[in-house]
């Protein structure tokens, strides 16, 4: 039921299928019919995932990340899915893909996030673009730091930085509370004559 903390809901609406496979959907706001083709988006997601098997899991991570963005309006999950289609690579490691996504999406969001099928225009006309862009830029900085830490073999630091970006649900080692243990002394080896 909707009154639960995490309800499972399904939206159902009447549609009329057109000859080109697009759908006519009634809009109560405009009192007109809107054209859409959700099957196009589904196919694009399938193709991207076929090329890079981490696509769908990363999209889920990004949709969860958006809920922590402070914004005048709630960011629709479809906005994140379309940005992922536009900005996630089709190969590579997950950390590098996230780094690339946040950097590219911070630019892309300024151009508007539109229906990839070309029917509806902007997906979320009331999107707080400035807030989302700022959050994407901050995320890009954190992703850069995490990737740089990993490149320096500071995996604990990298994991903590990813946790800073994605929240406490992201697993990371505990922060050090004391100084590092000193390195064991290196014995002095001298070359002395034998015999």
Protein language model features and the residues they cover:
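Histidine (H) residue identity feature
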Residues: 6, 48-49, 119
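Long, contiguous, structured domain-core segments that constitute the functional module of a protein
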Residues: 16-71
